[in-house]
Amino acid sequence: VRGKARLSDEEASRYCVEYGDVLFQRSSENQEDAGTSNVYLDQHVSSAFGGFVIRGKKVGEYNPLFIKYLLGSSSIREQITHRAQGAQHINVSQDTLADVALMMPSMREQEAAGLVFLHLDNLITLHQRKLNLLKNTKKSLLNKMFV
């Protein structure tokens, strides 16, 4: 929660999340959610992460937006979930994540693909809002007509 917690300088440097860092869910109750990821895309504000998350620091050249979509793809998710271990709680380790093979196109292609997927997500969100508005309008009209 932004602005609601304080960290020592040592904690802040150890748990700091910056633009381009990748965050992986360490543990899950089901196989499908094990190792789900997100990429920190705020370029202006750093944040902190907790103990149930594995942070991958941005060390090489990659487009963070592209990585966000790549890590959510079915082929990468399959690699991660296939390697996850556990019975009651399914866990993913840093070693597991290090073994995931990523096919990285050129930076130019990464930037283009990331923007295409972002645009598609924005269109989906816009149409979902319109759909919800139409459903609510229909419901309201039905309620008024058949009182």
Regions from the PLM with identified roles:
Residues 1-147:
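Feature detects amphipathic, helix-rich regulatory segments
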